[in-house]
Amino acid sequence: MTGEDERIEMEIRKRNGESVPFQQEKIFNAMKKAFDGQGKEIGSREMDEILATVLNNLSVTVPLTVERVQDEVERTLMERGHYEVAKAYILYREKRSALRRVRHTIARTVGDDSLDEVLRRIQMDFTEEVYSLAALQMKFESFCRLGMTEDERAEALTKAAVELTTAEAPKWEFIAARLLNHSFRCRNAQEWEGRGVCDLYGKLRYLTDKGLYGDYILAHYTHEEIAMAEDFLCPERDELFTYSGLDLLLKRYVIQSRSRVPLETPQEMFLGIALHLAMNEDSDRMGWVKRFYDMLSRMEVTMATPTMSNARKPYHQLSSCFVDTVPDSLDGIYRSLDNFAKVSKFGGGMGMYFGKVRAAGSTIRGFQGAAGGVIRWIRLVNDTAVAVDQLGMRQGAVAVYLDAWHRDLPEFLQLRTNNGDDRMKAHDVFPAVCYPDLFWRLAEENIDAPWHLMCPHEILTVKGYALEDYWGTEWEKRYLDCVNDPRIEKRSVTVKDIVRLVLRSAVETGTPFAFNRDSVNHMNPNGHTGMIYCSNLCTEIAQNMAPIEHISTEVHTENGDTIVVTATRPGEFVVCNLASLSLGNLPVEDEAYMERTVETAIRALDNVIDLNFYPLEYARLTNQKYRSIGLGVSGYHHMLAKRGIHWESDKHLAFTDAVFELINYAAVKADTALAREKGRYALFEGSDWQTGAYFEKRGYTSEKWRALAKTVAVQGMRNAYLLAVAPTSSTSILSGTSAGIDPIMKKFFLEEKKGSMLPRVAPELSMDTWWYYKAAHLIDQSWSVRAAGLRQRHIDQAQSMNLYITNDYSMRQVLRLYLEAWRAGVKTIYYVRSKALEVETCESCSS
């Protein structure tokens, strides 16, 4: 624009009454757009002449208003013969005027003038006709009633946007989120204004004094550091939320007063978590606070639900799941029940291995037929899960595991079915079976072969060893030795009998989960120090286990008081610290970006180990010995659909293989660097990491991998276990992506919640992604199994992998999927989700 040297200093009154400096560039740009919109070319000289005429005529106008400027532009264009451009400019003005009118009408009806700016941003960001605010106004007015308060009208406006969400107009869920966020922020600002608090430090001081925030945050950070952290906040990232995600976060994740009033914003929540996770960093602590905050607030990484909920709070139990080995003794069983109760009290889920507990009819102190079997004890576990309900929020959650050769297996497989003796049922636990390779081999080659069920206590008594302590060929040799020993009582059935019970229960109840014990232990990077008997509640954890053992009970006298001291050997009580990469929100093709993101997530998870509040000392000791973590993924189907990759395609298989190899490489690289900085885990020597067997078993033979293996051998590893893919049912909603590694259930559906219907939309649903979102029950499950097998090579632990079947599936077809998974090296199978079956989701492992 050539007339800048002749700038006229004036003020213009905006429509809201505010006076601001007049910017003639805006007139120039508006006219230029009008000419461009009509496909008309205009020389710079003529444009300057038009602008000069407009400015000259405006210079005598007092006061100068927006409408007066636009009137003068129209008049000048017509005087110079540009009628079509002037007409287009007039129509454009009318359209803008209509947009303003609908905004003002909605804001006035709600009674909130500040809403106008939110609506203006919505109009700018959602320009398609299907997202017209006129439709929102019409729906909103149908909800309005006489006597409604301003808050009720704001809630009705949000509800209107929610109900406009359809498969054809999915972005209304983002508009609804903005409206919800505006209402929340207005109320939140009023809450803090009423308390006389105006900055982040003041908020943290108040929350700490009220016992809602852990005092350790302000003890570790100075006032200046908190002020620096406040500058990291990016409120605009709230616009990444869908309505479902923001609604869930405000109801369950942000800190609330004791009267259930939310007291922190979503961004303050992410920052609070980051402050906690970086608390003990020695160097560049504020830099790590920012990196942790950025990965969380950009929704590129989600921490597990306990970490998201409890970080920054006084009781900061950050771990998701725990796994206990139940001993075969009265004291041991009740200790395990007590452990479960304490874990459940603080929101953790539990896996319990019952494979060492003697079967029904076994001996007790030599008395024949005295043992009641595992079912009676599992019923106590069931009642504990119901009784310890986390302050009335939700009941405890536990998976109980039993070996496929245990004599109580037939009754165990009917724990949750609807027929049979109710005294032998436990409907609130999740049964899971530990299968040896021999079982699947017989199911594939000779399903009518005999299968012998035995009591582990009887084997230990007769043979002097515990059969469950072995795996692979050594287990097979000892199993056959027991089968051929007439001193050991057998309950002989066929493989087909067990398969039939397993599949019937799976189709009817979704369980038992499957744990392929030989595959797990063969690929265990820490097999030099122990064995893995079972997995956790959600079947993604595979870590060394050992039962807690009673050593002695002694009586002492101290200061005249009698003290009873019980000594125990802590065993290996498994702990899961989880987080997930949101693959749908990440540039997975960008190797450098992925490596940096994985490095940040690994460091955050490692910090959880030292910062955690442990409900049990056994858990703390095991976690600090192995320093195990579980980095997983969510948004798997989201990632594929965004890239135009069909689930049922070879391209899917090749892509997932490449992505998970990249994730694993980045994780190992980050972890060994962390070991160099902070020290290796205690049992590194002799592990597959140290010997190189970890890399050999997975076929990592490229130059890049060989170089990394050498580095690991020298530097060590910070964490004994690295990767585990959890279900992420809740946190995937927060981050607006698909759950875990599952395909979506439907492109669009309505979920009934507290009397209203909430729309659920596939992530980033559009005409570009529509045909790549195939519903889970319509997918050929063999593609899912093959993909799981490829991923499993790169995952040192396991995956929460579901099978989706319809009523058309035969038992033989379901068995074929189990066999295919076993052959592919898949370590675990979570639910078998029949289309007609509702199954419960694990919130503890949601990451």
Predicted region positions:
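Terminal amphipathic helices with adjacent charged low-complexity linkers/tails
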Residues: 88-95, 102, 172-204, 435, ...
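Core nucleic-acid recognition elements
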Residues: 2-8, 18, 44-271, 287-293
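Short, surface-exposed, low-complexity cationic segments
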Residues: 23-41, 115-129, 271-278, 739-744
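Function-dense linear segments that define catalytic or interfacial modules
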Residues: 255, 261, 270-285, 289, ...
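Conserved, charged catalytic cores of large soluble enzymes
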Residues: 189-283, 366-380, 392-396, 401-536, ...
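Catalytic alpha/beta core of large soluble enzyme barrels
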Residues: 222-234, 238-247, 539-543, 605, ...
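Internal maturation/activation junctions in enzymes
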Residues: 295, 313, 337, 597-620, ...
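Alpha-helix capping and helix-loop boundary segments enriched in small/acidic/polar residues
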Residues: 18-22, 42-45, 110, 261-264, ...
